[in-house]
């Protein structure tokens, strides 16, 4: 059992998601419906996209705490371009390019200037948030065109166009990380940096790519945010970076790099979003959301930590088992045989 969990760390997140879906069903049978699933998925899309980007960065043994600010900055650019009369495709492409550029800048600080990731992205968190507020003057962006909201309108099976795009991106990234040499380079870089270099992996380039794609995912999350609510507040993206990191940790992505699967991060994001829907079902006031979500997250992390210790003990036991096995005992020769030999 431990070996199975060891090879499938996202199983704990899946169990948490299933339990959080089934248990409220005993209070309200209507909760157990396809409509609930589509509603939770629609709410989870932003966090899923951010968790996917954070996964790439964390696999390389880094962390990015600026993605919330990138999301807000990119959402503001999208709104400004649309209100200036640019078409939706042009505005979306420019928004994605801005996110890519912001992520590239983060990666360059870490890979080329050797600044610790947490320090570099703490700096850019304030920088990007400041740019966002300078562009807006501290005001909200409203009056966005109706075609933007159509991106989040139900299209097929109750899922929007952006929802289907998110599913495709999850499937593609899961395949990329699991089945290609390029994807395995992220694991190698985070697991053993020097070893990866000796194997020919361009570790600096991999880290820059990870941060760049993370920024692009944050920009896409900004587009989703704007399309879902139809306006852009000046606090857009605040606090999302911590939720994205928490979703990854819940899904089995190691903070030490080199291990985890993208599906685990997606399940972690779904779990955190589903907590909010359960609290609404239980009619718990909204100001309890962060407290209860943090409490549940802490409980899951404690359980995950204890499980990790058990797995490590199991691995050590397997590794050194052959050295600890006592040698077979040799039976002493009988006294009769000794006399015959004499």
Swiss-Prot record:
Transmembrane segments: 14-34, 39-59, 70-90, 93-113, 115-135, 155-175, 213-233, 252-272, 284-304
Organism of derivation: Shigella flexneri serotype 5b (strain 8401)
Membrane topology designation: Multi-pass membrane protein
Protein name (record): Autoinducer 2 import system permease protein LsrC
Subcellular locations according to the entry: Cell inner membrane
Subunit details: The complex is composed of two ATP-binding proteins (LsrA), two transmembrane proteins (LsrC and LsrD) and a solute-binding protein (LsrB).
Topology feature Cytoplasmic, residues: 35-38, 91-92, 136-154, 234-251, 305-342
Periplasmic membrane side: 1-13, 60-69, 114, 176-212, 273-283
Main location per the UniProt record: membrane
InterPro entries the record matches: ABC_transp_permease (IPR001851)
Entry function: Part of the ABC transporter complex LsrABCD involved in autoinducer 2 (AI-2) import. Probably responsible for the translocation of the substrate across the membrane.
Record keywords, A-Z: Cell inner membrane, Cell membrane, Membrane, Transmembrane, Transmembrane helix, Transport
Upper classification of the organism: Bacteria, Pseudomonadati, Pseudomonadota, Gammaproteobacteria, Enterobacterales
Family as reported in the entry's similarity comment: Belongs to the binding-protein-dependent transport system permease family. AraH/RbsC subfamily.
Gene Ontology CC terms: plasma membrane
GO MF annotation list: transmembrane transporter activity
């Amino acid at each position: 059992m431990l070996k199975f969990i060891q090879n499938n760390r996202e199983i704990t997140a899946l169990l948490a998601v299933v339990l959080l879906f089934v248990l409220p069903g005993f209070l309200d049978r209507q909760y157990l419906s396809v409509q609930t699933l589509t509603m939770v998925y629609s709410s989870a899309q932003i966090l899923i996209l951010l968790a996917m980007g954070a996964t790439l960065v964390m696999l390389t043994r880094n962390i990015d705490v600026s993605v919330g600010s990138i999301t807000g900055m990119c959402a503001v650019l999208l709104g400004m371009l649309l209100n200036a009369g640019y078409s939706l495709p042009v505005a979306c492409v420019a928004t994605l390019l801005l996110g890519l550029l912001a992520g590239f800048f983060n990666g360059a600080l870490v890979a080329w200037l050797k600044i610790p990731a947490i320090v570099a992205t703490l700096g850019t968190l304030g920088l990007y948030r400041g740019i966002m507020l300078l562009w807006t003057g501290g005001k909200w962006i409203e009056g966005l065109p109706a075609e933007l909201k159509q991106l989040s309108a139900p299209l097929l099976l109750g899922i929007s166009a952006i929802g289907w795009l998110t599913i495709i991106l999850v499937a593609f990234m899961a395949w990329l990380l699991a089945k290609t040499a390029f994807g395995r380079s992220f694991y190698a870089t985070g697991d053993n940096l020097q070893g990866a270099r000796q194997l020919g992996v361009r570790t600096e380039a991999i880290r820059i790519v990870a941060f760049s794609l993370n920024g692009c995912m944050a920009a896409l999350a900004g587009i989703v945010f704007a399309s879902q609510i139809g306006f852009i507040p000046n606090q857009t993206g605040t606090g999302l970076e911590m939720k994205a990191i928490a979703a990854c940790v819940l899904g089995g992505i190691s903070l030490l790099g080199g291990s985890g699967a993208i599906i685990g991060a997606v399940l972690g994001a779904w779990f955190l979003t589903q907590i909010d829907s359960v609290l609404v079902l239980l009619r718990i006031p909204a100001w309890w959301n962060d407290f209860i979500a943090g409490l549940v997250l802490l409980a899951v992390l404690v359980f995950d930590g204890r499980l990790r210790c058990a797995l490590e003990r199991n691995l050590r036991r397997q590794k050194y088992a052959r050295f600890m096995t006592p040698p077979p005992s040799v039976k002493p020769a009988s006294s009769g045989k000794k006399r015959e030999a004499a």
